[in-house]
Curated annotation (Swiss-Prot):
Name of the protein this chain belongs to: Peptide deformylase
Biological process annotations from GO: co-translational protein modification; translation
Domain of life assignment: Bacteria
Organism: Flavobacterium psychrophilum (strain ATCC 49511 / DSM 21280 / CIP 103535 / JIP02/86)
Cofactors: Fe(2+)
Stated family: Belongs to the polypeptide deformylase family.
Length: 194
């Protein structure tokens, strides 16, 4: 089932999310719905808060990046078929010289900005079968994971750009909060205050 994606300004996007257990109600269905929602919106990652759930769950499918002409053959091979579910993730390490890449977010439609992130990460998480894993990633895969991990920590990519750049996107963010954004996918708009 395709779920509506929560838009910028909704308080759930600013929550530090709660861990879940393997007995979480409808976990398998929630994960399946998140993948369907992400694919419908042409995304490469989606975190549970983006569908209104304040839980430590996010998904990544970096395969679409594997067709890019701007990456090495080695990175393209790593991206090809990369699809994972991350539950109760903990970022153990972020290291290396930060590099910039233009990021966007399904909760912030039509906004893209350069964000600096470390190229190498070590992350601990449970997969969809609740098998505990500790893995290292680098490059674009690491970046997508960091972006989605930020969501479960209540952080958005717009928090990582300069004050100067924030001024340029201020009107777009306001439009999203006012329900004026019109992406090609279902969105749950922030309720207007009365």
């Amino acid at each position: 089932m395709i779920l509506p994606i929560v838009g910028y300004g909704d308080p759930v996007l600013r929550k530090v999310c709660e861990e879940i257990t393997k007995d979480y109600i409808n976990l398998e269905e929630t994960i399946a719905n998140m993948y369907e929602t992400m694919y419908n919106a042409c995304g490469v990652g989606l975190a549970a808060p983006q569908v209104g759930l304040p839980i430590r769950l996010f998904i990544v499918d970096a395969d679409p990046f594997s067709d890019s002409d701007d990456i090495s053959k080695e990175e393209a091979a790593a991206l090809k078929g990369f699809k994972k579910t991350f539950i109760n993730a903990k970022m153990l390490k972020e290291e290396g010289e930060e590099w910039s890449f233009s990021e966007g977010c399904l909760s912030i439609p039509d906004v893209r900005e350069d964000v600096y992130r470390n190229p190498n990460i070590t992350i601990e998480y449970y997969d969809e079968n609740f098998n505990k894993k500790t893995e290292e990633y680098n490059g674009l895969i690491a970046r997508v994971i960091q972006h989605e991990y930020d969501h479960i920590e209540g952080v958005l990519f717009t928090d990582k750009i300069t004050v100067f750049k924030k001024q340029f996107i201020k009107k777009k963010l306001q439009n999203i909060m006012e329900g004026k954004a019109r992406p090609d996918y279902r969105m749950k708009l922030v309720p207007k205050k009365r």
